[in-house]
């Protein structure tokens, strides 16, 4: 049975009667039918599941090529995975991620890391790149043949006081972008310059039409632009689609992402799998029951 998302996509394509295929040049990432795309990163990727902006546009751009998308991003995460740790040592975080990679077996992994370095004057950049390489090695070990996409973090914004001027941080992000471009080449990974696509180094002064709520975290309108530019950075073109049809796709994606979030980050996990599972551990068997619901989404 075709999923709800697939049916909505086909209806949308039929409405505007356009067909889109990715070009074969070197600036285009080639998706294959049936690809399993996993998003890995920190807050900018994690919050995408709130807005459902990226996946509908990717689906429209790919046309008949069907790609599933699963969001494994985690707010505050770094390439070392420490934010993912619960009650154990910091290393537990990367072990947790390893288990989720085992579960999903991605054929494509899109990673966006490093924004925190902009606020640290790029201190620790060598260690960051070493950790990034180790993370990619882990992904490749879990999913041999996986294709890697490295995404440069988008810019931050300088807003009205008392919020700080983030001009220096944007210069740091520009330098980080340059380092990530070289890193991606060395890793035989596709590179997306999200920083430049979102405007690059802004002009001096305050943002006149801000896309963030505080200079760092993007608004719903910001995510609309982020999503469109990310698809563009993959070398794909998004066909025109009627607003109601795109909204239907967006709602279907948000529903699917909510189900998946409850699958891999369930509430009260301590009772399900942790040190209190003896109290309610019998409920752990219900977590895999999300899988068929997610597949239909």
Regions found by a protein language model. Give the residues of each.
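Sec-dependent signal peptide recognition
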Residues: 1-7
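Acidic/histidine-rich helix-loop elements
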Residues: 71-92, 119
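Conserved catalytic region of serine esterases and O-acyltransferases that act on ester linkages
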Residues: 19, 32, 186, 209-297
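Substrate-gating cap/lid alpha-helix
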Residues: 158-194
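Oxyanion-hole/transition-state-stabilizing segment in secreted/luminal serine hydrolases
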Residues: 40, 50-52, 89-129, 260, ...
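Serine-esterase "nucleophile elbow" of acetyl-processing enzymes
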Residues: 17-75, 90, 97-105, 109, ...
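Structural recognition of the beta-strand scaffold that forms the well-ordered cores
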Residues: 36-40, 68-73, 107-113, 147-152, ...
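Hydrophobic h-region of N-terminal signal peptides that target proteins for export
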Residues: 9-17
